[in-house]
């Protein structure tokens, strides 16, 4: 018998079939679902996020879906707080939290905690944005390369959201984002060595993806085409028509949305939009695989297998998560 209550992480790249498997598991286990997806938190963004259907959500409710307006921001710290609260409620009812999604930073934050980063500073952000307008984003990236070369190596000059945050952390705290994270890693290692855990649950880690990467690429392309057929452009048009949303917001920078937004701005033809949307989704999947390859104690399932439910249940039984 485990001393800590059980939880299940179901991870994987985009278009791998995570939602379907999570629903199948919840049919046979006393599970309640928690979404781990930085785009599914937003209302009115259904098609481009491949959000579970209204019928699915009615029958199999997911926590942390449709909790924010697209004008709002949502951080890994926000997710960790919300997820821990939801997990505690689910556990108190005698059920198992099943966390499903592909935002690997959220899973990592939940499992290991977060570095004690400084809060957002409106004045610093305004100055950085003004500098970017005056001198270009490459200039800001050059500044970051001086104070935090590790972050500069992983943040593209055309990623203003992450670029501003990295410089903001340095200017507010005097410490680079990399230094903050190294400090957190050291604290986590020390806690683990002393027997303490950041997440007070016994976690079983499942991941699902096609064994053949080409199959995943085909699924990504097909799903993007299906989204367009389902009215993805109209969905983004509705967001634009509000008048208070813009391309710099985290919600609109989500994969697919930023390409459609650029198309509606006249920057991309429909063909270019579709091609870039598919490429961006494939790049997202590649980043997700990079995270997953470094994950400890991960049990893989093949998206194309017909017996994933039984395989998942067998694994969960083997690690005593169902005891």
Curated annotation (Swiss-Prot):
Top-level class of the enzyme under EC nomenclature: transferase
Residues engaged in binding substrate: 14-19
One GO molecular-function entry: ATP binding
Record keywords, A-Z: ATP-binding, Magnesium, Nucleotide-binding, Transferase, tRNA processing
Chain residues that bind ATP: 12-19
Region (Interaction with substrate tRNA): 37-40, 161-165
The protein's required cofactors: Mg(2+)
Disulfide linkage: none
InterPro entries xrefs: Dimethylallyltransferase, IPT, P-loop_NTPase
EC number from the UniProt entry: 2.5.1.75
Residues the record marks as site: Interaction with substrate tRNA: 103, 125
Gene3D superfamilies linked: 1.10.20.140, P-loop containing nucleotide triphosphate hydrolases
Record's catalysed reaction(s): adenosine(37) in tRNA + dimethylallyl diphosphate = N(6)-dimethylallyladenosine(37) in tRNA + diphosphate
Quaternary data: Monomer.
Family per similarity comment: Belongs to the IPP transferase family.
Name the UniProt record assigns to this protein: tRNA dimethylallyltransferase
Organism field: Pseudomonas syringae pv. tomato (strain ATCC BAA-871 / DC3000)
């Amino acid at each position: 018998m485990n001393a800590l209550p059980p939880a299940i992480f179901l991870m994987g790249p985009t278009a791998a079939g995570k939602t379907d498997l999570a629903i199948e598991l919840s049919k046979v286990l006393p599970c309640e679902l928690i979404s781990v997806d930085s785009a599914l938190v937003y209302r009115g963004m259904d098609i481009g996020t491949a959000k579970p259907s209204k019928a699915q959500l009615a029958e199999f409710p997911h926590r942390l879906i449709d909790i924010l307006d697209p004008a709002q921001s949502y951080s890994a710290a926000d997710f960790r707080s919300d997820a821990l609260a939801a997990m505690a409620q689910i556990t108190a009812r005698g059920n198992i939290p099943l966390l499903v999604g592909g935002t690997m930073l959220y899973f990592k934050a939940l499992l290991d905690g977060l570095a004690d980063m400084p809060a957002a500073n409106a004045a610093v952000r305004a100055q950085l944005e003004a500098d970017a307008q005056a001198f270009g984003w490459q200039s800001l990236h050059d500044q970051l390369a001086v104070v935090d070369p590790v972050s500069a190596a992983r943040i593209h000059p055309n990623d203003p959201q992450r670029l501003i945050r990295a410089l903001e952390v340095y200017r507010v705290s005097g410490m680079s984002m990399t230094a903050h994270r190294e400090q957190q890693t050291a604290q986590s290692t020390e806690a683990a060595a002393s027997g303490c855990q950041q997440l007070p649950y016994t976690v079983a880690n499942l991941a699902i993806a096609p064994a053949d990467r080409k199959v995943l690429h085909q699924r990504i392309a097909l799903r993007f085409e299906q989204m367009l057929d389902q009215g993805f452009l109209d969905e983004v048009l509705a967001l634009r028509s509000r008048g208070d949303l813009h391309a710099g917001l985290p919600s609109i920078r989500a994969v697919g949305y930023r390409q459609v937004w650029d198309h509606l701005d006249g920057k991309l033809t429909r063909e270019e939009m579709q091609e870039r949307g598919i490429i961006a989704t494939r790049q997202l999947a590649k980043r997700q695989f990079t995270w997953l390859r470094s994950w400890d104690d991960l049990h893989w399932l093949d998206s194309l297998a017909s017996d994933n439910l039984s395989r998942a249940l067998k694994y969960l039984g083997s690690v005593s998560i169902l005891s």
